[in-house]
């Protein structure tokens, strides 16, 4: 899976515009928070955030920093999706723990080597188990937990 396919899949989960009162991200469009949109220079109404800008944000701020293109195909999307929901550093730490290397939150040569040497299905299971445990402990779990659990478990099927 390469970025364009991952982005298209991500859009099936992130939807269009949202301003859910329980979401600490506030206003989002295509899953991009208003804070992130402003950081990259977008000044318009969040309801009008262009899809091509969202695509660029996801490539530059999530896909590339987790070095998804260099990861085993089986875990690429899961690591990218986790970065989108919980941050690049947290996603990297889950991958590192799953691969048995020091969890420093930065995907470098050691992480890539360990991830690529691991059994991809086992690596994915360990990564997703950590993510689900983390999400279940969040105060927003009652509002969003059912959707998060479906999203995370769907990654086992792909």
Spell out what each predicted region is.
Residues 1-158:
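Cell-wall polysaccharide-cleaving catalytic domain and substrate-binding groove, primarily
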């Amino acid at each position: 899976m390469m970025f364009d396919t991952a982005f298209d899949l991500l859009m099936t989960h992130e939807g269009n515009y949202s301003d859910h009162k329980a979401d600490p991200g506030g206003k989002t469009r295509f899953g991009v928070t208003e804070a992130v949109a402003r950081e990259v220079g977008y000044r318009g109404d969040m309801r009008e955030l262009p899809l091509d800008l969202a695509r660029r944000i996801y490539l530059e701020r999530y896909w590339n920093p987790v070095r998804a293109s260099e990861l085993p195909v089986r875990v690429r999307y899961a690591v990218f999706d986790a970065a989108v929901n919980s941050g690049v550093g947290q996603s990297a730490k889950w991958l590192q723990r799953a691969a048995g290397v020091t969890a420093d939150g930065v995907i470098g040569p050691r992480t890539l080597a360990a991830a690529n040497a691991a059994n991809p299905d086992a690596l994915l299971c360990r990564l997703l188990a950590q993510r689900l445990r983390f999400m279940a402990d969040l105060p927003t779990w009652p509002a969003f937990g059912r959707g998060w659990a479906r999203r995370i478990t769907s990654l086992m099927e792909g």
